[in-house]
């Protein structure tokens, strides 16, 4: 039987809040389902609350609200945080991504998350 995890998009006000919302959707109050992009990808691969047969969907309600909250402004904020700890070898790339986000261009946090879901759980994402 397909399990449906619901993300209430109006509650997603930034990336940190997304981690809380997805954790609760999958694993209940105070649940964990990643606290960074790599951990989120790992959780989607199984063993962290999703069914072993991988028969689940993620229904992201009010996705347009989340898309705005996780847009270029939030992306720039996250990239500034990343820039503070990025290895020198990756600094120029992150600075370029930050410049794009500050100009309102390029991939957003919302894009990062949906791309990870599509990659790790193909066909599981339902944007509403």
Descriptions of predicted regions:
Residues 1-128:
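Positively charged, polar, low-complexity stretches
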């Amino acid at each position: 039987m397909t399990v449906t995890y619901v993300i209430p998009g109006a509650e997603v006000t930034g990336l940190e809040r997304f981690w809380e919302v997805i954790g609760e959707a999958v694993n209940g109050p105070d649940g964990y389902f990643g606290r960074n992009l790599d951990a989120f990808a790992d959780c989607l691969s199984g063993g962290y609350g999703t069914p072993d047969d991988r028969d689940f969907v993620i229904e992201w309600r009010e996705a347009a609200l989340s898309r705005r909250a996780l847009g270029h402004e939030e992306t720039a904020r996250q990239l500034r945080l990343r820039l503070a700890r990025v290895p020198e070898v990756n600094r120029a790339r992150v600075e370029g991504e930050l410049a794009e986000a500050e100009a309102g261009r390029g991939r957003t946090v919302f894009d990062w998350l949906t791309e990870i879901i599509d990659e790790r759980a193909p066909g599981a994402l339902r944007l509403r």
